[in-house]
Amino acid sequence: MKSFDEMTPKEIVRELDKYIVGQTEAKKAVAIAVRNRIRRQKLPEEWRKEVLPKNILMIGPTGVGKTEIARRLAQLSGSPFLKVEATRFTEVGYVGKNVDSMIRDLVEISVNMVKQEKMKEVEERAKELVEERILDALVPESRAVPAITNPFINLITGGQQQQYTPEDRRRFRAKREEMRERLRRGELEDEEIEVEIEETASPFMGIFGPGMEDLGIEISNMFSGMLPKRKKKRKMKVSEARKVLLPMEAEKLIDMDKVIQEALDRAQNRGIIFIDEIDKIAGKESASGPDVSRQGVQRDLLPIVEGTTIMTKYGPVRTDYILFIAAGAFHVSRPSDLIPELQGRFPIRVELSPLTEEDFVRILKEPENAIIKQYQALLSTEGVELVFTEDGIREMARIAYQLNQRLENIGARRLYTVAEKVLEEISFEAPDIPEKKVVIDAEYVRKRLERIVQDEDLSAYIL
């Protein structure tokens, strides 16, 4: 498979088609946006500064694929991705999260992403170091060879001094190599050992109340560099010790300064922020009430989307080249209800179409992570073969579509609810089913859902 930087917009759309049904216009828009980023990197320096990303506004009801398109795109491109709800934020001066916290969160995600990549690169070396630490615990030097006590040295030092002969050293090395072989063969996985680990608990996190978590994290990070890291000894099995020690040893092998430098660059030039429910902060100008705060959030959001510098604990971050994708249903408000300056910062507008019954059929069958494929994989672990007939799939799609028309339209999410109810009995009885092949046809689907679908009140609560 090609690297992402070599993929054309058509190929990006084809990759997205593997997971998301329909919505071609939205896929095209995001594919062009990320391809333009790659093109920008190839420009001369003076032009690179001038070319800014074209932010996208997705308009469509819930459950049609807005978030999934952005998330899959970020995974495909290896970009730091953050999803936020516009309603989480409050105007500066009010209790709650300020909008610039989204940039700090994006940088944190970017740092963790780069750190994991670098740790993966040094994993083999880290495994060797973990093996040595486990052997140190399994074969401590003092236990492996008997000590020779020198009374004259004891008199001078005031304590016992251990001395080892060459023969003792040879025996110790032989014992250690023997244990190494057994360890590699997996014979010692259940042995209990005592290892020294660093404590990760933060003493400041419990002090601050709801809405103040960010402050607790910042203060904790500030003091973590000043206070020495506390270590404690823990008893655990060799298998558990390997999992605990591997990230600790890998972290020692990477250069955090380089990690932070690369992470900041990636966040600034490849970061994607998905702002959901932006329609909830849109509204006509009002002198009082909640609209004051909504207008304030929009005005606070404006400089970040336009391009500004936000201070983070890793250093300053420019937001000029971060791609912002905003989304909303816009049932009550319209995109034109956003303040004009913010509207201008989302020049690409894409309308996502509501899902049809045929779309539901395709969603159940086609994506690589399709719902029925997930259930088949889950129940195969119990030895149950789940077979969905064509009419069974169509019946599930028909019922989900009808429920969306009658009740609240929640898009493709309705399929999860319907599928869960259809397969509830099988999931419960799976370990005890004598017949390991189960066929889900239209009759079975109707039998499981008929009473609930017909009863309006039950449908509202259960489906």
UniProtKB/Swiss-Prot annotation:
InterPro entries: AAA+_ATPase, ATP-dep_Clp_protease_ClpX, ATPase_AAA_core, Clp_ATPase_C, HslU, P-loop_NTPase. One of its GO terms (molecular function) is peptidase activity. The keyword Transcription regulation does not apply. ATP binds at V21, G63, V64, G65, K66, T67, E68, D276, E341, R413. It is found in: Cytoplasm. It comes from the Bacteria. GO terms for cellular component: HslUV protease complex. Keywords: ATP-binding, Chaperone, Cytoplasm, Nucleotide-binding. GO terms for biological process: protein unfolding; proteolysis involved in protein catabolic process. ATPase subunit of a proteasome-like degradation complex; this subunit has chaperone activity. The binding of ATP and its subsequent hydrolysis by HslU are essential for unfolding of protein substrates subsequently hydrolyzed by HslV. HslU recognizes the N-terminal part of its protein substrates and unfolds these before they are guided to HslV for hydrolysis. Belongs to the ClpX chaperone family. HslU subfamily. A double ring-shaped homohexamer of HslV is capped on each side by a ring-shaped HslU homohexamer. The assembly of the HslU/HslV complex is dependent on binding of ATP. This is ATP-dependent protease ATPase subunit HslU. The gene is hslU.
